């Protein structure tokens, strides 16, 4: 059996690696000959995927921000088409990554109409889409959906799609891989009297430009107002390190840089995280660390979103979306200033009542994400679906 898995960006590589590992384990237990090939990043390759192209750094949010990736994405898609013409697959598994994945799925739907397509982790068009067009595009190419959020499952079930809610795979990652606060601080050589602030600015290149300066400015202010502040910054992709180091130098900040694989350690050790909006917000919440969440896109992208698409979401972070209330502060676009970030951070660090409420909200969030064993359930559903489709075509 050959399964093609397609995703992109840092978060897709992480989610994909967890699925690849679970698929390989189940195939071994079932004595099933399984070949996994596709698009992703180093984590997926390390887990056992034959990588056709590395797409971990190819991703953006916004119209103008995506322009630089048009040619690389097109080239990768042509490579995928050539591969699939000579290497038939039994199942296509898509993970998030809406634009590129829909292009591949539409090609396969037209060229091989009987090929089954499973979406694992649907793009969050169900949250942010201003029209029904994006939902219709996903529905048109999806035979089965494995949802990680309850709201995601409910939304697509109402649209008539075959959906199974498996829970969020980060539950498994945190359970198996995350260190305790004490062991994380010991590993990093942090004294008990130090206040640790972990900075998580970017999984996309555009975020270094739009978010890192404000984050550094906020860190500067917090260091000037609090004693014994230690700053940590895990670098999600090695290619980002030169730009990060240059920005830190401009702000005269002393920050302990860590490899991306140390992200959970950097979070677990923290008293506060200052972070971009994204999947990492759930990791922070599952490790019970207060966080200030921010996001920015180019002014042109935001102007188009507001005026043409009437962009007006109550929340953008998954921590707030899951519970449908603002359990953590979000600072978006013009609000994402250094002073606003620092002020929100001080409130989270110094207000004991707020910290107690955060702990309660985080527990509710954890319960809403399902039970551990997510990756095993997802892998089982993928293999059962693939086997069922093979038998129906036989």
From Swiss-Prot:
SUPFAM superfamilies: UDP-Glycosyltransferase/glycogen phosphorylase (SSF53756). One of its GO terms (cellular component) is membrane. Its EC number is 2.4.1.182. It comes from Synechocystis sp. (strain ATCC 27184 / PCC 6803 / Kazusa). HAMAP family: LpxB (MF_00392). GO terms for biological process: lipid A biosynthetic process. Pathway: Bacterial outer membrane biogenesis; LPS lipid A biosynthesis. Pfam families: LpxB (PF02684). Belongs to the LpxB family. The keyword Lipid metabolism applies. This is Lipid-A-disaccharide synthase. It is an enzyme of class 2 (transferase). Keywords: Glycosyltransferase, Lipid A biosynthesis, Lipid biosynthesis, Lipid metabolism, Transferase.
């Amino acid at each position: 059996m050959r399964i093609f898995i397609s995703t992109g960006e840092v978060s897709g590589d992480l989610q994909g690696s967890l699925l690849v590992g679970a698929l390989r384990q189940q195939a071994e237990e079932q004595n099933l000959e399984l070949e996994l090939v596709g698009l992703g990043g180093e984590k997926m390759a390390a887990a056992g995927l034959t990588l056709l192209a590395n797409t971990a750094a190819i991703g953006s949010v916004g119209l103008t921000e995506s322009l630089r990736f048009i040619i690389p994405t097109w080239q990768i898609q042509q490579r995928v088409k050539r591969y699939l013409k000579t290497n038939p697959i039994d199942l296509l598994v898509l993970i998030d990554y809406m634009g590129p994945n829909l292009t591949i799925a539409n090609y396969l739907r037209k060229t091989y109409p009987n090929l089954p397509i499973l979406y694992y982790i649907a793009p969050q068009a169900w949250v942010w889409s201003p029209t029904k067009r994006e939902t219709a595009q996903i529905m048109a190419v999806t035979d089965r959906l494995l949802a990680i959020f309850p709201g995601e499952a409910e939304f697509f079930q109402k649209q008539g799609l075959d959906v199974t809610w498996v829970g969020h795979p980060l539950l498994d990652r945190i359970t198996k891989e995350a260190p305790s606060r004490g062991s994380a601080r010991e590993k990093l050589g942090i004294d008990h009297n130090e206040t640790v602030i972990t900075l998580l600015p970017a999984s996309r290149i555009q975020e270094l430009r739009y978010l890192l300066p404000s984050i550094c400015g906020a860190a500067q202010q917090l260091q000037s107002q609090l004693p014994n502040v230690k700053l940590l910054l895990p670098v999600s992709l090695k290619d980002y390190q030169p730009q990060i180091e240059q920005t830190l130098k401009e702000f005269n900040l002393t920050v302990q840089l860590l490899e991306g694989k140390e992200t959970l350690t950097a979070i677990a050790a923290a008293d506060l995280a200052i972070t971009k909006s994204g999947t990492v917000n759930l990791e922070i919440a599952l490790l019970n660390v207060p966080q200030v969440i921010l996001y920015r896109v180019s002014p042109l992208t935001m102007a188009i979103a507001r005026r043409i698409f009437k962009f007006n979401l109550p929340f953008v972070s998954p921590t707030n979306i899951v519970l449908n209330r603002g359990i953590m502060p979000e600072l978006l676009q013009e609000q994402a200033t250094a002073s606003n970030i620092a002020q929100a951070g001080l409130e989270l660090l110094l207000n004991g009542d707020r910290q107690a409420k955060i702990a309660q909200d985080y527990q509710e969030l954890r319960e809403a994400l399902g039970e551990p064993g997510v990756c095993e359930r997802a892998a089982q559903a993928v293999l059962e679906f693939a086997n069922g489709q093979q038998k129906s075509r036989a």
